[in-house]
Amino acid sequence: MKLFGTSGIRMKNLDPLIAYKVGFAISKNFKKAVIGRDTRTTGNLIESAITAGLLNGGCDVTILGIVPTPVLGFSAKSHDIGIMITASHNPPEYNGIKLFNNNGTSFTPNQEESLEEIIEKSDFLDPSWDIVGNVSEDKTAVKKYLDYILSNINIKKKFNVVVDCANAAACGISPNLFTNAGCKVISVNSHCDGRFVGRMPEPNEKNLVETVDIVKGLNLSGRDFIGIAHDGDADRMIAIDEMGRVTDFDKLLAAFCKYVVQKTNAKKIVTTVDASMAIEEYLKEFGAEVIRTKIGDVSVAYEIEKTGAIFGGEPSGTWIHKSIHLTPDGILSGLRVLEMMEFYDKRLCEIMDEVPSYINLREKLPCPDELKNKVMKYVSKEGKLLFKKEPETLDGVRFSFENGWILIRPSGTESYIRVRVEAKDETFANELLNNGISLVNNGILK
């Protein structure tokens, strides 16, 4: 039974029986679990089901209630395992389960496969009275997290910030932390509602229209508000600059990488195969190495640990700040954007305008799951002949050129193959995209 995808388990109308089985499987190897959840309407149901499975197997459970993923990851340090019930940016009918080690990192694919094997082999016997685990609540977890983050940031300037919580797990916590950091805060969509009545939890330009209007309106009088918007579990964020522009994920990541290198003299930065070449261009003058890894925060965290890098990030807004903790943290990332602005003594819009802009094109092509492996082999072989380049196969198939690159990669959650290109001019970008589409379509037909 394949349950885990690229970011834990994530399903429409997640069956509580699956959650029960996952809990029982976890109890085979872990005896102290902590559980958090986002605001989705099925959160209580899934929490109860997974708790029942854990207790049946003799695992003690600590319940945090509604908390962001970074709070859960931080709390996992005092337990054997952390369990976050969330579907992140997906619509309200979805829910999911994401697992964390007690160092704050997400479970690896190997760990997830081991759990799937246990689920396949388990008979889920009735509980025995003498091994059933205990349940407790921890009402101090959020305060411990807030105190820890505040002790690790240093912002002297009084910034004006609109914090958009998406009616999700960041509610109360993110606005509170920004306020305690000395900011003037206006919170938006900051009451918990698992129907996501204010906006859908994906923090993109389409969903942030009203928040952008609020930032623009506040800045008519020259007050220089920026916006920080979270997803469903607040492991990610995106910023809105003083001009009311939703910042490009790639450009914001490139700007922050430069800040980390300049401030700390870091020699290594970790990012993923789908991140912009602007990062290399931007860091070239500082001699910092850009290490690319597979897509997903677990791969970024692993590479950070392996290489000794102090920061790693994905162009989805998922950033990991090793000096503070290894769990992706959208609330901390928002605060560190303010640190960057203070360091340069510039408005966010000025910082963003300095980052190189390239042409980015994306296409997703329908492909049956059973054909994906065959198609990717075709893409690698024929792409090598077409582009006269060796393919990079770390995650999908990527071909890099002096003026751009193309990445062709099967989706881990949908029946699609995604094509992404980046280039310094539009003609080359369109050429790469058309070639990529042809490779995939021909691979399906072969």
From Swiss-Prot:
What are its cofactors? Mg(2+)
Q: For this protein, what is the EC number?
A: 5.4.2.10
Question: What reaction does this enzyme carry out catalytically?
Answer: alpha-D-glucosamine 1-phosphate = D-glucosamine 6-phosphate
Q: Extract the signal peptide range.
A: none
What family is this protein classified in?
Answer: Belongs to the phosphohexose mutase family.
Q: Its function?
A: Catalyzes the conversion of glucosamine-6-phosphate to glucosamine-1-phosphate.
Protein name stated in the entry = Phosphoglucosamine mutase
Source organism per UniProt: Methanococcus vannielii (strain ATCC 35089 / DSM 1224 / JCM 13029 / OCM 148 / SB)
Taxonomic lineage = Archaea, Methanobacteriati, Methanobacteriota, Methanomada group, Methanococci
- Gene of this entry: glmM
